C-alpha cells in the first residue's frame, strides 16, 4: 500500500503544478469546435509525406493514401475500402475488384493501373515492400476496375495483412519521379484518395484538412472533424495538463497514473476499469541462445517461471496493461489459434520454487554459499538484461525482473544503453537478455508474431527481422512458413498448436505483458469515442495505423456542442 500512497501523493503534486504553472504554446487559428487535436505519434517536426518511407509523417497513410481494405483488429473484420471485393479464384490467383467513381485529390480518376503501378514500382526499385516479389509472379489490370495477382508461391497469411497495409499511390504523379528520388523526395503536397489533405506543417504540429469531396462520404459517411491537428510529443506532465484542460482531445501517449485521475477529469479509455487500455503488442524477454547459459533450454524455462508478471503489470504500469498468456497471443485474429491444452501442458506461471528446481536439476547451484548460483562448471553466473535508456516503464520492468532473479539466486543486472547502442547490440547478438516487441503488434494473423519471435533470418552478419536471441530451429521455421502458405483451416490449427508447443518447450523468449494502445480521450469537444462496448473503430494515430480503425473513429465521433 505504501507504493500506491506515494504514487497518489506524487500525482496530486504533479496535477497541482501542471494546472497552476504549466503553459503550453498552443494557439489554434482554427475553429476549435471543428478541430480534433491529437498527440502521441510524432517525435519530431513533420518532414516527409513520402508513403514509401515507413516512418513518414503519421497520417500520410490513411488520411491521404488509402489501402484496398481496412481492418478492425478488435472485431477481426475486414472492410472493403478502395476495393469493393477480393477473392482467391484459384490456389495462386487473387482477383481484386475496385470501387468506381473514386478520384485522386487533383481530380484524376483512380483505377486499376494505379494498383498495378504501386506493385510494379516495388519490383523495379528497392523499397520496403519489394520482398513481396519473392513470392508474387505478376499483377495485371484486366480492365479499369479489376486487378489479377498471380503468385509463384502464395503466402496467404501475409497477403491477408497486405490487403490493409499497402497504400495505393497515383501512377500519374509517381511515374514522373526519377528512381533515385523515390525515397528522398519529401512529397510535401501528397496527392491521395483519402478523406484529408495536408494543410500546414509546423515545428510542433501537423495540420490536416478534411477533403469534402472524398469518395467515401457516400459509402461510409463524412469524417466529423474539419481539421485534425497532430502535435509533436511533449512531456507526460504537459500532455496530462492539456488533457485536463481540454486542449487535447485524443492522447496516444503512455501516461503513467492516468487511471487515477480519469474519473476526476472525465477522461475516457477503452475499458472503464483495469486494464483501461486495449492491448497493442507483446513484450517479450529475449535470451541470447548463442551465449551460456541461455543456450540451455532448462535454464530458459527456469527464467519463464522466475518472472513475476503481476508485479510488472501492477507496480510498473498500475494496471494499465494485461499480463501475457504463455503463448504471447492476444486479440481475436490470434487467439482463434490459441491451443489451451498446449498451454495447460507446457505453459508457465510465476513459480520461484519451480524455477529453483529446474536450475538445480540442470546444475546451477550455489556452491560457495554466497547467495548466488554458479554455472554447472563452477564459473560465476552473472548476466545483464538491457532496454533502451529513457524508456522508463521498461527500465522499471527489468528492475523488477532483476529482483525476481535475485530471489532465486541469479544475478541479472539491468543495463540501459542509449537507443542507438541498444539497436547495435541486438542486431549483433551482443547481449544476454533484452525486452523487445518487434512484429508483435496486433494484426490479422499470428504468422506475424511467430515470424518475429522465431524468424529464420539469423545467419547473416546481423539480425534485423526479430528472433533477437538467434534461436535456431529449422523444423519450427518450416512449420511457420507452412502456416503462411496453406489455406485449409484445419491444417492451420494443427500447425498453430505445434508451433505453440515448440515455443513453450524451448522457450527462446518469454512473453511477459501486452503494452497498451495508449489512448486517453476528452469529451469537451468530441464524444462517442469507440470503447469495449462499441468497438466500431480504434482511436490510434500512431504511424500508418489509421487503417486499423482510426478513419472509422473520425467518421463516428460526434461534436459535443
Task: Enumerate the language-model features and the residues they cover.
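Ligand/substrate-recognition segments at binding pockets and active sites
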Residues: 38, 203, 235, 365-441, ...
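N-terminal lobe/hinge region of extracytoplasmic solute-binding protein
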Residues: 39-89, 120, 191
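Local pocket/hinge segments that shape ligand/substrate recognition
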Residues: 41, 162, 221, 252-358, ...
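Detector for C-terminal structural segments
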Residues: 55-59, 204-205, 210, 304-341, ...
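Gly/Pro-rich hinge or "lid" segments in bacterial periplasmic/extracellular proteins
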Residues: 72-77, 165-222, 227, 237-238, ...
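Aromatic- and charge-enriched surface segment that lines or borders ligand/interaction sites
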Residues: 84-128, 142, 148-150, 293-294
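Surface-exposed binding/hinge segments that line
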Residues: 87, 131-176, 524
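Ligand-site clamp/hinge motif
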Residues: 184, 213-261, 399-402, 411-413, ...
